[in-house]
Amino acid sequence: RAEVPREGKTFEEKRFVVFYNHSQEMQFAESLGAILWETAEMPWAFHFDLARHVADEVRHAQMGQARLEQLGHRLADLPMMTQHYAFRRNLDPLERFCLMTLVMEATAFERKRTNVELFEANGDTDSARYESYDIRDEMQHTNLGHVWVPILLRVYHDSRSVTELTDHCRQTIAQVISEYPASAANMIKR
């Protein structure tokens, strides 16, 4: 089985980490799908936007898988990350949606733009195009968080402000990350 580096040192390792992480975005899609199920009280427009978000995350996973295969990696040789399922299942749909849109996706732009620059500097236009496409989707998803989190707060009678909820979600993800072992122990090996 291949070991998956957490951070790459060489260009090839860095590129691998980027697209391996994209290949794991089905977890994001499934967490969003759970939100669809759990938010029957929300208006149709929310479900419409969330369904599009789910489709985008599925596409990102497919993009990552396709790029890894183009680069010569066999998906069957790579472990599947599972650590996000464990902590996101314990969050209510409001916290989960805020965490995913206003924390996780909203804080990824600098890293993703750096990836695009790295790919372009190394003449890898395919990877740069994939990552640029992902950035555009994530911008839309962050905007959905700005639109829907305040409405979710009202619908579910949560007295926190958007800022208070976002800060809580930042603390939650920081705690979870600090508890992850630095090994592949949180992955399913195929």
Ranges and model annotations:
Residues R1-R190:
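Non-heme di-metal
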